[in-house]
């Protein structure tokens, strides 16, 4: 890890990045809880991770749905997490807690930095009251400090009682695709007009490997007006954007010479309805750029394509340029706060930032 030259910053007056953690690491907490231990995990443990997350991962504030992921999605995600940064909390050889750190290239107010994005933080429901989450947090902090990293990015559902200072927050919106199914589970009113997203001669097609160079360059240009944004490489585009069945779907439009002029990408995850046990398929809007049409036109073409891949609704957050999407949508219960640990930075408007929505 230390040989990868991960952490180059060029600090300016807008933000301050701490290179040393000012808090004292707690004593090994597992010693205080009999039977618990820490275990380093990897993709070989995907079945255990899948079971834990699908039963105990985050729910919306009203406890209506739980976000769940397919086994294939988790395997794909974990492959990009560096060794030693998929950390499990075990109780008598059973996985009861998880935390991961995915290192992402970000530009934050003109500072280019590779930063750990903390994700899939999960503790089994029945043991949350014992404060076991601190075990995972302290273990991750310790491993990061060993490679000289005292900062991180993370998110959490909006909590009215939280005293933590976030630098921005976003709200999720949904555009119905499979209206009959969404009506049957109560996600949209019975009297809501059915939407027909079918478009004849849709110019979008799935992205292919030969598009990676062009897409990488154009996305970085399209994102450059944002103060907080990813910096994409051909490697990260290959992993996070190139289509992979049941994980990521990316569509492009080409001109008469075959050059990509427009692109749009979504991730696939699911909403598990706690009361009924029914499952809704979500397309989570991610990266895009548009040169030959406005954003609403691009999303309309996307909705037509998503019908053929079994998606029930398109979900998007009100960051990036997403406020320009002029299509009937429904506000969800998904409100997310964004934090920069050990980074002092300005409050940031959602339309001035973008993070990979995974």
From Swiss-Prot:
It is an enzyme of class 2 (transferase). It catalyses: N-terminal glycyl-[protein] + tetradecanoyl-CoA = N-tetradecanoylglycyl-[protein] + CoA + H(+). The keyword Transferase applies. It holds the Pfam family NMT. Adds a myristoyl group to the N-terminal glycine residue of certain proteins. Belongs to the NMT family. This is Putative glycylpeptide N-tetradecanoyltransferase. The lineage of its organism: Viruses, Varidnaviria, Bamfordvirae, Nucleocytoviricota, Megaviricetes.
């Amino acid at each position: 890890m230390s040989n990868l030259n991960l952490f180059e910053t060029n600090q300016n007056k807008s933000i301050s990045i701490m290179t040393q953690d000012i808090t004292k690491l707690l004593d090994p907490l597992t010693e205080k809880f009999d039977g618990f231990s820490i275990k380093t995990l990897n993709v070989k443990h995907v079945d255990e991770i899948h079971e834990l997350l699908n039963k105990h991962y985050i729910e919306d504030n009203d406890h209506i749905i739980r976000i769940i992921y397919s086994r294939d999605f988790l395997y794909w995600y974990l492959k990009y997490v560096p060794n030693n940064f998929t950390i499990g909390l075990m109780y008598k050889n059973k996985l009861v807690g998880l935390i991961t750190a995915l290192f992402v290239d970000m530009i934050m107010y003109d500072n280019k930095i590779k930063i750990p994005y903390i994700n899939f933080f999960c503790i089994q429901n029945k043991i949350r009251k014992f404060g076991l989450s601190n075990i995972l947090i302290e273990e991750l902090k310790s491993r990061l400090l060993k490679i000289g990293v005292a900062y991180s990015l993370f998110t959490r559902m909006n909590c009215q009682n939280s005293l933590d200072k976030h630098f921005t927050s976003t709200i999720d919106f949904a555009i119905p695709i499979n209206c009959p199914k969404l009506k049957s589970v109560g996600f949209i009113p019975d009297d809501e007009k059915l939407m027909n997203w079918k478009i004849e001669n849709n110019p979008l097609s799935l992205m292919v490997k030969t598009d990676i160079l062009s897409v990488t360059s154009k996305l970085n240009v399209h994102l450059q007006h944002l103060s907080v944004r990813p910096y994409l490489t051909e490697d990260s585009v290959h992993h996070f954007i190139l289509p992979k069945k049941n994980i990521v779907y990316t569509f492009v439009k080409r001109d008469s010479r075959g050059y990509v002029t427009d692109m749009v990408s979504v991730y696939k995850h699911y909403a598990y309805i706690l009361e009924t046990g029914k499952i809704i398929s979500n397309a989570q809007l991610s990266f895009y750029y548009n040169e030959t049409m406005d954003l609403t036109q691009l999303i309309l073409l996307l909705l037509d394509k998503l019908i053929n891949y079994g998606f029930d609704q398109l979900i998007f957050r009100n960051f990036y340029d997403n406020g320009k999407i002029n299509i009937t949508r429904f506000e969800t219960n998904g409100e997310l706060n964004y934090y920069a640990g050990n980074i002092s930075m300005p409050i940031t408007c959602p339309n001035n930032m973008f993070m990979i929505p995974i």
